[in-house]
Amino acid sequence: SKNPLPTLKQMEDEPAKLLEEKANSGHAVSGKPTENQAAKSGPTNSDGELTKKIIESLCKAIIDVEPTLTKYDTVVGDGDAGETLRHCAEAVLQYLKENKIPLDRATSTVLGITEAQESSMGGTSGALYAIYLTGLVQGLLKSTQNNGEAATVKHWASAANHAFQSLGKYTPARPG
């Protein structure tokens, strides 16, 4: 039977065009928690320095794999995915260097990463990543009963599920 889910190519049609128009309008993605809300709510990072090292390691891995991502994207897309992700990773590293990403609360950390991402990625992919990361912050805020507790795998899994559901409101693309 035919798969009812859209292909990546089909994603380039109307929903992607609408997202790109919104992304290029200069407006931030709506529903983004404020810095103040994120700084006072949600789970904490149990070890800020470890969190920083993990983020740095992930960014360096993205930078290292950029040529491979670009190669694959030239086959299935327009060839800019690797460069776009590398620019984002470089922006996150710069934000870390300038202490623009708070490391005390998981929500503040993701919000700082989101700001770096929004400053470095445009177009449809930039909008989609911003929606996902904003959903991740919202999910972290919803996942905690006690604002002082450290983020656990359970918090992150719940937040990631929330982010995925948020993204699903803006794009018909689904895994598979």
Language model: regions and residue ranges:
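N-terminal loops that bind phosphate or other acidic moieties
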Residues: 1-176
